[in-house]
Regions:
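Conserved AAA+/SF3 P-loop NTPase catalytic/coupling segment centered on the Walker-B
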Residues: 208, 247-275, 301, 311-318, ...
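Conserved catalytic/switch belt of AAA+ P-loop NTPases
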Residues: 265-297
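P-loop NTPase catalytic core of nucleic-acid-dependent motor ATPases
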Residues: 136-219
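Extended, charged/polar low-complexity intrinsically disordered regions
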Residues: 1-164
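C-terminal engagement/docking regions of AAA+ P-loop ATPases
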Residues: 418-435
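Short glycine-/polar-rich loops that comprise or flank the Walker A/P-loop
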Residues: 111-115, 195-196, 248, 299-301, ...
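AAA+/P-loop NTPase substrate/partner-engagement loops
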Residues: 206, 217-264
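Phosphate-sensing "switch" segment of ASCE/P-loop ATPases
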Residues: 295-303, 308-410, 414
Length: 435
């Protein structure tokens, strides 16, 4: 058996069929392939439904004095050494942070995971009786085995794509460069310390949403199909609770072609101003009058914008200018576009031609991404592109570092810097809408 076949077989053994319409997929996140009896599965699925479905959850509150649910914390604040949290089902309760962790580092890492929560009805209403994280620890043993196999064959890019359900064996070289950037926001440049921001405008049915769902459910990205409110995104002043940027590892804004129809330019402008500052300086303004003495919080997170192209433009005889084309969406300021590493305007193959839907179990997948990041951190060979200026030049370095860590040979030193930099820029601002 060849090394590549051995790698694919290993991935198959440690993966599951990911279907975003399958309500039972949470079992793979929580159990990571562990086999349990059917009765336990049913109990877990009901607890999960109570944790995400507000009406289903409320129906149990009407009849029981104790309710168990599985959910993530969507907002929280700390007051008098107690965590006050809002969950996906709308329930708000407080708990001692020692219930989920013994130290600050573990608390920080676990606060965004799926929680098992048991609440009881008391004299003064419902209260949290027990709470703890139920996600398994990252499986570095299996991840390292896969990583070493791919590294040996210089196929890290293939391992990454395969791990997210893409079928590299079906892909042509061009396809690899069209789909790989969807996963770049998982990584951080060791040179500029920036994470990768990405815009994709492509046809429907290419697997965008499926990939974004994995980023949401496994890597704790926050997924939006409409513009977020300031309270949801940054800070809820009414309830004095942290917003999405404080509890997520990234933001995904999908279906952006619909945004301008439902929101005023003033509303979009306010959100864009916040996003622009957050993208550049990792500074998110919380506003005055909050309980915290600090008016701003620093956190660096990547952002993905995605949507579908306008039909009137697809059939033009020439490719549109990439950034000019995005003016159609009325949500991108020049400041935001300046902070985007990669923009793709592309007609891509549909998912049936490039996806096998076999995704690594989350405990392995998260460990694999960590290992790839370590490889990125140890990559320091790049060229400075004199054809680019300022921020764009720094972004080109970030992309060179990540591509090389994924075993994409840029042939640095074997061809002219001018040729390489031109290719990198075309990768950063790509369009085939007029092809």
């Amino acid at each position: 058996m060849s090394s590549q076949s051995h790698l694919l077989e290993k991935i198959k053994i440690h993966s599951f069929f990911y279907n975003p319409r399958d309500t039972e997929r949470v079992l793979n996140i929580i159990l990571s392939g562990k086999q349990i009896e059917e009765r336990k599965k049913i109990e877990i699925l009901k607890a999960y439904k109570r944790g995400i479905d507000q009406q289903y959850f409320q129906s149990y509150l009407l009849f029981d004095n104790e309710v168990k649910f599985i959910s993530k914390i969507t907002n929280f604040k700390v007051k008098n050494d107690t965590v006050i949290a809002r969950f996906q089902n709308g329930f708000i309760g407080n708990f001692d942070p020692h219930q989920i962790a013994d130290n600050p580092e573990d608390f920080y890492n676990l606060i965004t995971s799926y929680m098992f929560v048991k609440i009881r009805k008391g004299v003064n209403g419902w209260y949290i009786n027990d709470i703890y994280s139920i996600e398994p620890q990252n499986n570095y043993e299996i991840a390292k085995e896969l990583f070493d196999l791919a590294n040996q064959e210089h196929q890290t890019y293939a391992l990454l794509l395969q791990s997210f359900g893409y079928d590299v064996q079906k892909m042509e070289i061009q396809d690899i460069f069209l789909y790989l950037p969807r996963l770049f926001p998982l990584f951080k440049s060791p040179i500029t310390k920036r994470q990768i921001n990405y815009v994709e405008i492509s046809n429907r049915g290419t697997g965008k949403t499926t990939t974004f769902m994995i980023l949401q459910e496994v890597f704790n990205f926050r997924y939006y199909t409409e513009p977020p409110t300031y309270a949801n995104l940054v800070y809820d002043a009414r309830n004095n609770m942290y917003g999405a940027v404080f509890l997520s590892n990234g933001l995904i804004f999908d279906e952006i072609q619909n945004w301008k129809d439902g929101f005023s330019s003033k509303e979009l402008g306010a959100i864009n101003a916040t996003l622009s500052t957050g993208l550049e300086n990792c500074v998110w303004t919380r506003g005055a009058g909050t309980e915290s003495k600090s008016s701003t919080i620093q956190k660096c997170i990547p952002i993905i914008y995605a949507g579908n192209p306008y039909n009137m433009t697809i059939n033009k005889l020439r490719n549109p200018d990439v950034e000019d084309y995005l003016v159609n969406y009325q949500i991108f300021t020049s400041a935001i576009l300046d902070r985007i590493h990669i923009i793709q305007l592309a007609i891509k193959k549909t998912y049936d031609k490039i996806i096998n839907a076999r995704v690594l179990y989350p405990s392995i997948l998260k460990a694999l991404v960590d290992l790839i990041q370590q490889k990125i951190n140890n990559t320091n060979n790049y060229v400075v592109c004199d054809n680019l200026e300022s921020r764009r030049q720094e972004q080109s370095i970030d992309i060179q570092i990540i591509l090389q860590a994924l075993d994409i040979d840029l042939q640095i030193g074997q061809r002219s810097n001018e040729e390489l930099c031109k290719q990198i820029y075309n990768f950063m601002r790509f369009s085939n809408l007029g092809d």
